Structures are given as C-alpha cells and as structure tokens.
C-alpha cells in the first residue's frame, strides 16, 4: 500500500507531518509513504527513510491561497503532485493537513468523482457520550455549501458504507439533522430528503435529529448539508474548549479549596478531554471520489497525523471506495431515471 503525503501542508508542516509519518511507520509496516515537499526540510525531521520516498518540490499551496486558483496554477505544489500520484495509480490515497478548499478541489478535479454520484461529501467522526457506539459519523461538514434532497440521500448512502466498512457498525442508524424530530419539520429540501431516506429500504433511517442530541448516541450516521455541518462541527469544538476553560478559571479563582478540589478532579477532567478529542479518530474524509482523500486539522501535531494515517490505511484496506463505486455503478440506471422523473416534475 502506498500513501501520498502532502508534507508541506498545515500550520506545523513539515515538522509535525514528518514526525507523524515516522510514528505511523511503526503501526503500519506494510505501507510505503511518499512525501511531497522540500527534501532538505523533510530530512531535518526524518530519522531514517525506511518505507519512505521523498519527491522534492519547492512549490507549496498555503492556507491563504484561493483554492481553485491554487490548484490550477500551482501544478508543482506538494498537494497537487500528491493528488496526481493518486490519479496516476502511483499511490492509493492522499493525506494533507493543508488548505481545505484546495484539497477538496484537487479531489474533485484531479482524482475525480465516482460515476453516478452528483456530489461528494466531507465526513468526520465525532464522539458519542452515550449510546451503543463510542463515535458517530457526520456528513457533509464542508464540501458543499448548498445541497438538494437527492444529495442528502446520497450522503446517507456514503455514510452508511463508511459506518459499515470503516467504523465496523452493523446496520448503522442514520438520522437527518433538522430543526425538530417530527417528520414534517424543516424546509422543502429537508422534507423531501426525509421521504427519500424513509423510502430507501437499504438504509436504517431513524428519522430527524436535533443538534442538541448529536452527542447522545442517537445515531451512527448524521446527514446534513455542508454549511450546517461545518457550523455544527465548529460549534461542538468551540463549546468543548470554552467549557473546559470556564471550569479551569472557576477552579483557579476559588482559592485554596478550589485548587485542591481541582487537583482531585484532574483525572476526571483528563478523561473528559480525552473522550471529546475527535482528532483521535483521524481526519475528515472526502467520500465520493475515486480514491481516499483525508484531511487533518491544520494545527495537527505528530500524534494526530499518525492517527489520520492509520485511518487512511483502514479506509484503503476496507476497499470502501471500490464498494461505493460498485454500488453507484449498479444503480446508475435508476439514478438516471430518477433525474428524468424529477426534471419532468419541474416542467
């Protein structure tokens, strides 16, 4: 197995990316890592080059670059060369902690969509505080600002395969993020999406879910549009950090007794922080393209990079992309007919 790594992408690149690759090698002895970036800078942090190949390039897509322009103009950047390697069959997957928009564009324009799928979705794994499973998957969390009901249905299919193949959940419970649990809640798109999900016998659809219930283990896969999903994701992250900060400040401002109590609760706080750390699950996955595309947080450290690379290995090993491609190929005619029927309804 070969994983193409954008060694220059991210706030802490290349140091934390290279160190993360070094850690991942210990867990993944069957993987060859192809690092794209400035060879002399990569060499500073690589103790040895066992199972590692470096492809030198001086060009880098920065966080400030406009995504589509960067993909078109920076042909020799570390991210684009890594994506081209996947397209050409020289690597099985791509990993980057760099510019999210540019990676999405590279996934769409270079690696390409699975035939029969209208729009890919960005998928992330979040912790469940209670329920049958420790985590749940949510998509879309940023690939599409606007979505049609059909897209939300497709996201449910993508999430169902991800839950089954990668998360190893049997018959994942799928819920639609909405402003109420009743079937008739939401706008026209969500009402239509509800019916599509309800009528798809291949999905274990459990109905609508409100955002306040997301972490309570109600569903294994939560479906939403990219704008809402991204806002919810950042809200969860921000709320968790703010609450921990508030508790810490309250303890420190309550004198000796408060500090002693905080010391006694230190282990409990560490457990809570560990449970809420979704970076342990790896990165966000662009589902619906012809090869695994995994995006880690820009501020990822070496351990988080390692976790994401282990996740990439799991995705490739599970043959998730092939299973998705086979599904949409098998249902291509019915998808085309649904599109024709929808167009006739609108005329």
Swiss-Prot record:
Q: Which GO terms describe its molecular function?
A: phosphate:acyl-[acyl carrier protein] acyltransferase activity
UniProt-annotated location(s): Cytoplasm
GO CC terms, sorted: cytoplasm
Instruction: Quote the catalytic activity from the record.
Output: a fatty acyl-[ACP] + phosphate = an acyl phosphate + holo-[ACP]
Q: In which pathway does it act?
A: Lipid metabolism; phospholipid metabolism
Q: Which UniProt keywords apply?
A: Cytoplasm, Lipid biosynthesis, Lipid metabolism, Phospholipid biosynthesis, Phospholipid metabolism, Transferase
Q: Which Gene3D superfamilies match?
A: Isopropylmalate Dehydrogenase
Which GO BP terms apply?
fatty acid biosynthetic process; phospholipid biosynthetic process
The protein's Enzyme Commission number: 2.3.1.274
- Provide the assembly information: Homodimer. Probably interacts with PlsY.
Query: In UniProt terms, what function does this protein have?
Result: Catalyzes the reversible formation of acyl-phosphate (acyl-PO(4)) from acyl-[acyl-carrier-protein] (acyl-ACP). This enzyme utilizes acyl-ACP as fatty acyl donor, but not acyl-CoA.
Looking up NCBIfam families in the UniProt record yields: plsX (TIGR00182)
The family line of this record is: Belongs to the PlsX family.
Return the protein name. Answer: Phosphate acyltransferase
Annotated source species = Pediococcus pentosaceus (strain ATCC 25745 / CCUG 21536 / LMG 10740 / 183-1w)
Q: Where is the organism placed in the taxonomic lineage, from the top?
A: Bacteria, Bacillati, Bacillota, Bacilli, Lactobacillales
Q: Which gene encodes it?
A: plsX
């Amino acid at each position: 197995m070969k994983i193409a790594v954008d060694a220059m992408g991210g706030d802490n690149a290349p140091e934390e990316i290279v160190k993360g690759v070094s850690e991942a090698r210990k867990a993944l002895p069957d993987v060859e890592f192809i690092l794209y970036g400035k060879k002399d800078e990569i060499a500073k942090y690589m103790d040895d080059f066992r199972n590692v190949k470096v492809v030198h390039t001086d060009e880098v897509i920065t966080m400030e670059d406009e995504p589509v322009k960067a993909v078109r103009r920076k042909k020799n950047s570390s991210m684009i060369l890594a994506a081209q390697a996947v397209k050409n069959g020289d690597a099985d997957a791509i990993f980057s902690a760099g510019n999210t928009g540019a990676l999405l564009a590279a996934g769409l324009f270079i690696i390409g969509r699975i035939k029969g799928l209208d729009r890919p979705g960005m998928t992330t794994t979040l912790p469940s505080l209670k329920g049958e499973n420790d985590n749940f998957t949510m998509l879309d969390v940023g690939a599409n600002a606007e979505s049609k009901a059909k897209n939300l249905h497709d996201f449910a299919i993508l999430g169902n395969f991800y839950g089954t193949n990668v998360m190893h959940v049997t018959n994942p419970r799928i819920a639609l993020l909405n402003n109420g649990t009743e079937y008739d809640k939401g706008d026209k798109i969500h009402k239509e999406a509800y019916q599509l999900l309800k009528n798809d016998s291949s999905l274990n659809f459990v109905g609508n879910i409100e955002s306040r219930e997301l972490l309570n283990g109600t569903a294994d896969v939560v479906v939403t549009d990219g704008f809402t999903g991204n806002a919810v994701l950042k809200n969860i992250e921000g709320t968790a950090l703010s609450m921990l900060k508030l508790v810490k400040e309250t303890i420190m401002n309550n004198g000796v007794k408060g500090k002693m109590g905080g010391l006694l609760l230190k282990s409990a706080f560490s457990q809570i922080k560990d449970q809420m750390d979704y970076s342990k699950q790896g990165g966000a996955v662009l589902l619906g393209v012809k090869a695994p595309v995994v995006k880690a947080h820009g501020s990822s450290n070496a351990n988080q990079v390692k976790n994401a690379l282990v996740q990439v290995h799991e995705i490739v090993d599970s043959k998730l992309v092939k299973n998705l491609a086979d599904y949409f190929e098998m249902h291509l005619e019915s998808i085309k007919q649904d599109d024709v029927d929808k167009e006739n309804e609108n005329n």
